[in-house]
Design a protein with these regions (language model features):
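Short basic helix-loop element that most often maps to the first helix and adjoining turn
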Residues: 18-35, 62, 89, 96
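Conserved hydrophobic/aromatic packing and binding residues within compact polymer-binding modules
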Residues: 20, 34-35, 45-48, 74
Length: 106
């Protein structure tokens, strides 16, 4: 794993949790329901959503399957403008946020 990849992973721990929470609420699923579907404890899911822990690849797959979304959606929702290099931010502003709204049906 390169330094950039490690930095991206560390930087996005909380964002992935927020993305899971946003998508879960959009689907009108409680933490308890999603945790049961993913075969993890409610405390574990809460810890992920609050950024206290980072989900494993297996857990990410289970969460995405349970929410009926591709993993790429979760990655898109976990990216914030702060994660984008300065020279690419214009693209994120023009496409990233509007795309998230379309996917959320807002």
């Amino acid at each position: 794993m390169s330094f950039g990849t490690k930095l991206f992973t560390i930087k996005n721990k909380m964002d992935i949790g927020n993305a899971i929470k946003t998508l879960r609420k959009q689907k009108k699923i409680t933490q308890k329901q999603l945790a049961a579907l993913c075969e993890i404890s409610t405390n574990a899911l809460c810890s992920i959503e609050t950024g206290q822990s980072f989900p494993s690849k297996t857990t990410i797959s289970k969460i995405c399957d349970s929410l009926n979304i591709p993993e790429s959606y979760l990655l898109l929702f976990s990216i914030s403008e702060d994660d984008i290099p300065e020279d690419k931010k214009i693209y994120f502003r023009n496409f990233g946020e509007p795309l998230k709204k379309i996917l959320l049906d807002e």
